[in-house]
């Protein structure tokens, strides 16, 4: 359908929209005035990664179009653990861990949003809610028959995977969050990933049973690449939005190196470039598409880390990859004593984090994919010794494939 609301029309045009409840009614409300909406983040890590970037972009669009976003931090629900999309029970976190994670997540979110965003912790109302009172007042309004049909529950049980009562009850807590946010802030819209659909609909149903007016829900699609795999992680781990956990340089490189087929979609999702410009960029072919990837990488990095940092890392990357400036390579030090009489390059690639195993290093060398100081390594048993460093000014430049590059400086 065509939306009158700028917010929903943008979601539809840029590929954010997966499911929504009562589209016509929600569109009418959002096109006639400001709406309060919330997105929740449990505090399971001390940062968010790009798997949460769609939700963060929607918070930005809510602000842009004059609506009122609420960021809900799960200080209480983190203690329980959402089973949605998980194959096993999450590890229990201590109060100190949750508190530290909450601070880290908040620090990330504030980079993306203006200062007037409302931030709330559901521990404010769930933390002191008595167990028996909660069961009587909230639990009585849920049907176990319906709960067993939730995808988060059904998928675990169908695979004969353990689901604790703690996780089973998570939907009650998230549902009550929606009710409480409506009471306190007049919130009528909850936004989440597609795995949150069951929890969102349950919250709408609970609100109706507790006498609230009609509430609404919107979900975004899973973040998948063109081959159908989840995006958000590399061999080195998650693509964190905190610069201390994942450098702006690596962040830029990640988006610069996405598959050709993903460029247009990621430009729509993670940049604020006009759609007409995105259509022009995604129509580029061959080598020209690399320019679109650079624009994508710089635009995404600018939103996360700031325009000045984005320009710096773009220039740094271009010096390394297009002008072979070794001074701009990521640098590590390596002990002369450790190197001794020489170590096989295949082993060093693993030690330096460039390959996941020694055998992977050997395969790379056999395929001609490893260069040391510009020369292709042909012998998978070749040793690297101190002379290789001394003959090159005290360092070696290691290139693995097209993307992994490292400057290793020898120290006494």
Swiss-Prot record:
Organism: Anaplasma phagocytophilum (strain HZ)
Intervals of motif 'KMSKS' region: 230-234
Primary residence: cytoplasm
Keyword DNA repair: no
A GO CC annotation given for this chain: cytosol
Record-stated family: Belongs to the class-I aminoacyl-tRNA synthetase family. TyrS type 1 subfamily.
Name assigned to this protein: Tyrosine--tRNA ligase
Residues noted as binding L-tyrosine in the record, renumbered to the chain: 38, 170, 174
Pfam families according to UniProt: tRNA-synt_1b
Subcellular location: Cytoplasm
Subunit-structure text: Homodimer.
Catalytic class of the enzyme: ligase
Gene3D superfamilies, alphabetized: HUPs, RNA-binding S4 domain, Tyrosyl-Transfer RNA Synthetase
Residue ranges annotated for the S4 RNA-binding domain, each copy included: 343-409
Residues binding ATP, per UniProt: 233
EC number, UniProt record: 6.1.1.1
Signal sequence bounds: none
GO biological process, one term: tyrosyl-tRNA aminoacylation
Keyword annotations from UniProtKB, A to Z: Aminoacyl-tRNA synthetase, ATP-binding, Cytoplasm, Ligase, Nucleotide-binding, Protein biosynthesis, RNA-binding
Molecular function terms from GO: ATP binding; RNA binding; tyrosine-tRNA ligase activity
Keyword RNA-binding in annotation: yes
Chemical reaction(s) catalysed: tRNA(Tyr) + L-tyrosine + ATP = L-tyrosyl-tRNA(Tyr) + AMP + diphosphate + H(+)
């Amino acid at each position: 359908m065509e939306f009158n609301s700028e917010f929903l029309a943008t979601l539809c045009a840029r590929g954010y929209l997966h499911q929504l409840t009562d589209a016509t009614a929600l569109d009418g409300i959002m096109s006639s005035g400001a709406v309060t909406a919330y997105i929740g983040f449990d505090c399971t890590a001390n940062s968010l990664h790009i798997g949460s970037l769609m939700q963060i972009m929607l918070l930005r669009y809510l602000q842009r179009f004059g609506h009122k976003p609420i960021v809900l931090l799960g200080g209480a629900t983190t203690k329980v653990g959402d089973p949605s999309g998980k194959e096993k029970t999450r590890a229990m976190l201590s109060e100190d861990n949750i508190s530290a994670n909450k601070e880290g997540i908040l620090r990330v979110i504030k980079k993306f949003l203006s200062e007037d965003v409302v931030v709330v912790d559901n521990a404010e109302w769930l933390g002191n809610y008595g167990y028996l009172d909660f069961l009587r007042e909230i639990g009585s309004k849920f049907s176990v028959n319906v709960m067993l049909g939730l995808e988060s529950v059904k998928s675990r049980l169908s695979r004969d995977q353990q689901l604790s009562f703690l996780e089973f009850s998570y939907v009650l807590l998230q549902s009550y969050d929606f009710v409480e946010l409506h009471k306190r802030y007049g919130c009528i819209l909850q936004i989440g990933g597609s795995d949150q659909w069951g929890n969102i609909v349950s919250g709408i149903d609970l609100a109706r049973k507790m006498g609230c007016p009609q509430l609404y829900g919107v979900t975004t699609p899973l973040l998948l690449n063109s081959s159908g795999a989840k995006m958000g992680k590399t061999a080195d781990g998650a693509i964190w939005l905190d610069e201390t956990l994942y450098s702006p340089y690596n962040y830029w490189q990640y988006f610069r190196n996405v598959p050709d087929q993903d460029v247009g979609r990621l430009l729509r999702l993670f940049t604020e470039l006009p759609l007409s410009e995105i259509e022009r960029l995604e129509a580029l072919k061959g080598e020209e598409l690399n320019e679109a990837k650079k624009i994508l990488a710089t635009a995404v990095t600018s939103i996360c880390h700031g325009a000045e940092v984005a320009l710096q890392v773009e220039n740094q990357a271009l010096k390394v990859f297009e002008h072979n400036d070794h001074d701009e390579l990521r640098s590590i030090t390596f002990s002369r004593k450790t190197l001794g009489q020489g170590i096989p390059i295949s082993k060093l690639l693993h030690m330096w984090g460039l390959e996941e195993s020694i055998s992977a290093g050997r395969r790379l060398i056999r395929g001609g994919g490893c260069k040391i100081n510009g020369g292709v390594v042909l012998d998978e048993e070749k040793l690297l010794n101190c002379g290789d460093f001394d003959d090159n000014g005290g360092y070696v430049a290691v290139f693995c494939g097209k993307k992994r590059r490292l400057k290793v400086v020898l120290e006494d």
